From Swiss-Prot:
Source taxonomy: Bacteria, Pseudomonadati, Pseudomonadota, Alphaproteobacteria, Caulobacterales
Protein name: Large ribosomal subunit protein bL33
Gene: rpmG
Entry's family note: Belongs to the bacterial ribosomal protein bL33 family.
GO cellular component: ribonucleoprotein complex; ribosome
Keyword terms, alphabetized: Ribonucleoprotein, Ribosomal protein
Domain of life of the organism encoding this protein: Bacteria
């Protein structure tokens, strides 16, 4: 999971590493 990833998914950390 990259914390600086451009892809953001709702309620998912698969692409960003951040909970959105």
């Amino acid at each position: 999971c990259k914390p600086a990833s451009i892809k953001i998914r709702l309620n998912s950390t698969a692409d960003t590493g951040f909970y959105v």
